[in-house]
Amino acid sequence: MYKSILIPIAPDHQRDTKAAIDLAEIIRDKDSKITLLSIVEFVPPYIAQQLPDDQMTKNVVDAKVKLQEDADGHRNTSIDVIVGHSANSILDYAEKNEIDCIIVASHRPGYQDYFLGSTAARVVRHATCAVHVLR
């Protein structure tokens, strides 16, 4: 079905990513690739100066370690960590890497989502490829 599947995972995820990876295994072609992606939120310079010098590097390394644990044991599965803003970074990454399916986890929408919009909602609205939403 799909040749290149993207699974965005929050660096601080407490949800089990197994459901997303299991779905990817079902909908993938035999030679397709799965990419687990974490976005470390960009910290503006006026805030970053209050953090330890190596904080962003530490955040990226920690995210890579968590993603690698999730990816272990799955064929043609790679990981990537980028710094940016979640929804925009997911959409840009999908476009640049010719992703044809995004599997995104979502929570039940709350009152604030109607004003702010969740990452999943923004990805669904603006993606140029198929999007599967897991609850």
Which role does the model predict for each range below?
Residues 3-50:
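Small/aliphatic-rich secondary-structure junction motif
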Residues 35-37, 78-82, 132:
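General small-molecule cofactor/ligand-binding pocket signal
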Residues 38-40, 105-107, 135:
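Short secondary-structure boundary segments
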Residues 53-65:
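A short acidic, glycine-rich active-site loop
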Residues 62, 81-85, 135:
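Short beta->alpha linker loops
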Residues 71-102, 109:
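Structural beta-alpha unit
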Residues 104-126:
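Glycine-rich, Arg-bearing micro-motifs that act as flexible, cationic patches
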Residues 126-135:
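Short, flexible loop segments at boundaries between secondary-structure elements
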